[in-house]
Amino acid sequence: TFPHMLHAKILHSDHAHARIVSIDTSEAEKMPGVLATLTGAEVPENSFGPTFQDQPILAYPIVRHRGDGVAAVAAVTEQLATEALEKIKVVYEPLTPVFDPLEAIEDDSPKIHGESNIYTSKIIKKGDVEKALKDSPHVFHRQYRTQMVEHVPLEPQATIASWDGNGRVTIGLVWVVLHLVEKIYLVH
């Protein structure tokens, strides 16, 4: 820890897909030792990402998955930050979630990300596919499914930063792709 360190905590949505109707942080802000609250509506340029900056820092006005961050608090102790999160009131309008990836790409599926649920699409053509299929002694048309693989990183979901008062910030974190993190922080 650092002297005079603040502890930040994120309030996560328990909805898979919803519209944020309102967020009331006033009760958390009244707590002694809570120095700041923040919502997605208050974040300028509310987006980040390693390749495309299309992920909200804090979700607003749409929650796109369970666990989306919707508000943040900074307090003098970790316990106080946790207690402050419990005082934040969020009103959601639930929207239809989509849990099946094959359903998500159908034209009539609810759109989670703007106009399409397809992140990106590229056509790669090499060789004569039709000829290869025609000339092959065996062609199999099957659908394969495998178990879901959970993303279980070894690194913790934590960052510590120290500001020296002269415009220099030192950030400590554990992340596999550190050069992408550096790029994100330099942009913001």
Model-derived features: where do they sit?
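Structural alpha/beta core scaffold segments of enzyme domains
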Residues: 1-188
